[in-house]
């Protein structure tokens, strides 16, 4: 028992961090600083990939959050260099390929095997298994190729514009739709990627998965359903945003619709989505408890 306690991972203070970890941190900074500098001043500055910085900083916080839990769960370290080195080398090769050929999916995606390899080399499989969700979380940071984004966003934009047009028409607003172009009164609105793209879906999916992992839901049914229902929740939130923008433009003009209120509608989107996630989780919690009580009641009857 004493041996187990001695080998338990403890969250180190700044004055006890070994120089090896400082060297690793400096190496990662030298390796990936140019990559993320380019992302912050390039791709992540566009509306299509605006979710990137949010997911990136949430990922950093989540790694910190999980590392702080290691002593609490008594996770022991068992370094596995034979398993970690091949994964680390693979990650470095992916980084070299991505950086040299300007393939962001490899350049940014290489961070996952690099961090996993370092974890296995110095901490082992137990810590790596404990951090599996944190590594999975990093997948949302990797920029997808443009053809994948275009193929995924076109049906979403069409569906959002279709729903918006029918809802506002039912409310007696003079609205017409041509593809993803909405005409309301004398104004035309283009349902762009930012209004119904993968950026909002990815961000909401990340927040939903983070919410599930932090709250430690034990019901597999509840976790699965909440993860799946985030997609229609994102759709409803996007429709709400486009409706708000259309009404602002119709009543206060194009300048209001494309100015500050356009950015404010993005806040409305996430508030709506988070409220729907919480409401959905409450319903799932109610039904999961109801289903869990049924077998226990039957077992009591059988004992009688």
Swiss-Prot record:
- TM region(s), chain numbering: 17-37, 50-70, 78-98, 103-123, 130-150, 189-209, 228-248, 259-279
Q: What class of enzyme is it?
A: hydrolase
Enzyme Commission number(s) from the entry? 3.4.22.-
**Upon deletion of the gene, what happens?**
Disruption of the gene does not significantly alter exopolysaccharide (EPS) production.
Q: Which NCBIfam families match?
A: 8TM_EpsH, exo_archaeo, exosort_XrtB
A single GO BP = proteolysis
The protein here is known as Probable exosortase EpsH
Question: What lineage does UniProt assign to this protein's organism?
Answer: Bacteria, Pseudomonadati, Pseudomonadota, Betaproteobacteria, Nitrosomonadales
Keyword annotations for this protein, in alphabetical order, are: Cell membrane, Hydrolase, Membrane, Protease, Transmembrane, Transmembrane helix
């Amino acid at each position: 028992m004493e041996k187990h306690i001695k080998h338990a991972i403890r969250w180190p203070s700044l004055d006890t961090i070994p120089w090896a970890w400082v060297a690793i941190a400096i190496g990662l900074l030298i390796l990936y600083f140019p990559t993320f500098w380019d992302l912050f001043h390039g791709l992540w500055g566009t509306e299509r990939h605006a979710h990137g910085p949010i997911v990136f900083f949430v990922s950093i916080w989540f790694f910190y959050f999980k590392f702080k839990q290691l002593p609490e769960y008594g996770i022991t370290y068992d370094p596995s260099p034979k398993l970690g080195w091949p994964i680390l080398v693979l990650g470095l090769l992916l980084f070299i390929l991505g950086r040299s050929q300007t393939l962001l999916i490899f350049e940014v995606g290489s961070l996952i095997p690099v961090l996993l390899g370092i974890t296995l080399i110095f901490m082992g499989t137990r810590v790596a298994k404990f951090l599996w969700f944190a590594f999975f979380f990093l997948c949302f940071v990797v920029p997808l190729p443009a053809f994948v984004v275009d193929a995924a966003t076109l049906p979403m934009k069409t569906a959002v514009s279709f729903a918006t047009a029918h809802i506002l028409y039912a409310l007696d607003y003079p609205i017409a739709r041509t593809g993803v172009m909405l005409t309301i009164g004398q104004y035309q609105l283009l349902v762009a990627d930012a209004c119904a793209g993968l950026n909002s879906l990815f961000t909401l999916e990340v927040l939903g998965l983070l919410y599930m992992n932090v709250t430690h839901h034990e019901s597999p049914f509840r976790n699965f359903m909440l993860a799946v229902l985030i997609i229609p929740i994102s759709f409803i939130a996007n429709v709400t945003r486009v409706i708000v923008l259309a009404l602002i433009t119709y009543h206060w003009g194009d300048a209001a619709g494309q100015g500050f209120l356009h950015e404010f509608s993005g806040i409305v989107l996430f508030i709506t989505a988070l409220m729907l996630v919480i409401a959905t989780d409450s319903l799932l919690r109610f039904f999961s408890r109801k289903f869990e009580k049924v077998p226990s009641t039957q077992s009591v009857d059988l004992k009688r």
